[in-house]
Amino acid sequence: DEFQRHKIGSPFETLPRGTRAILTGDFNCLPNDDAIKLLQTPCANGAPGYVDAWPLAHPHTPNAHTVDLHDATKAPRCFDFVFVSDNLGTHVRALTVNAETAASDHQPLLLEVEL
């Protein structure tokens, strides 16, 4: 139909692609929340879900705290994530959290991939 035709080739196209993708940000939820699980779930059209890069870089280690590290009134948590497309998973070499800076209530993350 007309609506679907305009979606093809646009940023909103939902067809599976062979491209690599990295998705980062402050998701304001914990690693086991439903919103995170949804990002990791394959799409109905066959496109794979995203992969959390933290366990790829740090197997068997819980996600590092990324928020409220420098606020003594709050408990540190992990709200910031780096996700990669499944075809980038084997290329993840490191993921680090800069715990030193207090420029924000969220800590910066640095992903290293080898292509």
Regions found by a protein language model. Give the residues of each.
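Active-site regions of metal-assisted phosphoester/phosphodiester hydrolases
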Residues: 1-115
